[in-house]
Regions:
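Carbohydrate-associated surface elements
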Residues: 153, 173
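Nucleotide-activated donor-binding/catalytic signature segment of Leloir-type glycosyltransferases, i.e.
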Residues: 243-259
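Aromatic "clamp/platform" in nucleotide-sugar-dependent glycosyltransferases that forms part
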Residues: 260, 279
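Short hydrophobic beta-strand element within catalytic cores of glycosyltransferases
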Residues: 296-299, 309
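Conserved donor-binding/catalytic core segment of Leloir-type glycosyltransferases
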Residues: 193-218
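N-terminal strand-loop element at the rim of the active site
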Residues: 7-11, 23-70
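A short, well-ordered alpha-helix in the C-terminal region of glycosyltransferases
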Residues: 325, 332, 339-347
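A short helix/loop element that forms part of the nucleotide-sugar donor recognition site in Leloir-type
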Residues: 179-193
Length: 347
């Protein structure tokens, strides 16, 4: 099949899953065409079965803002005709499903172009922030030829808000060949020269990820007398706040802010416990990646995370913002290597 895939090319779960899905489809003999404003984060290699089509933005004095939705629809339509696409798979209803539906309708009747939309959760939060987006978001979902959600939580939330339930749950995934615990002795030595256990946080450092809470948790762990270090992987608007809080608490020298990294699996393999204290997660891909690397997870009991992390078996769940309990759970895992290894193996 010739498959068009559109994702946000940013450092986030949807772009990662979309990229990995495309690569796995290509490995099975399909030809995948990524249609986006930039090369997706995890799409590091292009070949005859994995191709990239950049959406070109038009600068026109009449438009105050560049019309990305229309530009994307135009590129989708063009690629569909030139490459004889069999379907479009878009991640997020807004704006991607709207663009895909426009492209599909523009090609009728000479070409049939089914549209599959995968919901990742931002569509729900967008409507929650501004109800005026509800009709157009619902239109993008209802008019899709197929709709999937990444968790049962998200399916139920979509049903409640949009009164639409023809949704198939297909959880996010990681490739076991790529995500497994590796021997990264040199990296671990760099991150922890004195051999202390390592807490790690991986995200895009948006407020919803609560990276400052990771610093608060770590400070409480140190106060309990546990010798450890904190590794913060990623970048975003909250990074400066997290660094500032670490300095205020006098623990900055025990933290490593390493920014965006191309090989997350190396950092997960080097560390011992993942912190994911998010306000909201429709799934929690970082948790799944950590678990694949035998790293137990300390996370919020929110959204789809309980479908990923089994409390007391593969990690510990707590109410959002309960940094005291998260610190207790983290300290317990850091000092009990046997428990940590058992949980990691179950994960």
């Amino acid at each position: 099949m010739n498959i068009g895939i559109t994702v946000y090319p940013t450092y986030g779960g949807s772009g990662i899953v979309g990229s990995e899905l495309g690569k796995e489809l290509a490995a099975r003999g399909h030809t995948v065409h990524f249609i986006s404003s930039a090369l997706p984060t995890r799409l590091t290699e292009l070949n005859e079965h994995v191709r990239f089509h950049e959406v070109e933005m038009m600068s026109y004095p009449l438009f105050e803002h560049q019309p990305y939705t229309l530009a994307l629809a135009t590129k989708m339509s063009t690629v569909a005709e030139e490459e004889k696409l069999d379907l479009l798979h878009v991640h997020y209803a807004i704006p991607h499903s709207i663009s895909a539906i426009l492209a599909r309708e523009s090609l009728k009747p000479r070409r049939r172009l089914p549209v599959v939309t995968t919901l990742h959760g931002t569509d729900i939060t967008l409507v929650g922030a501004d109800r005026s987006y509800l009709p157009i978001t619902r239109y993008g979902i209802v008019q899709s030829d197929g709709v999937t959600a990444i968790s049962h939580y998200l399916k139920e939330a979509t049903k409640e808000i949009f009164h639409f339930d023809d949704i198939r749950v297909i959880p996010n995934f990681v490739c076991q060949h790529d995500y497994k615990r590796l021997e990264v002795t040199a990296l671990r030595q760099t991150l922890s020269p004195q051999g202390q256990p390592l807490l790690v946080h991986v995200s895009n450092f948006r407020p919803v990820k609560r990276p400052v809470d990771c610093v608060e948790i770590f400070a409480r762990v140190l106060k309990k007398g546990v010798k450890a270090r904190l590794v913060m992987v990623g970048d975003g608007s909250e990074r400066t706040n997290a660094e500032h809080r670490a300095r205020c608490l006098g623990i900055y020298e025990h933290c490593s802010f390493v920014g965006k990294q191309p090989r997350i699996v190396d950092y997960l393999s080097a560390c011992d416990v993942l912190l994911l204290p998010s306000d909201q997660e429709s799934f929690g891909l970082a948790a799944l990646e950590a678990m694949a690397c035998e790293v137990p997870v300390i996370a919020s009991r929110v959204g789809g995370l309980p479908e990923v992390v089994t409390d007391g078996e593969t990690g510990f769940l707590s109410p959002v913002g309960d940094v005291d309990k998260m610190a207790v759970d983290a300290a317990r895992l850091l000092v009990d290597e046997k428990l940590r290894r058992e949980m990691g193996q179950r994960a």
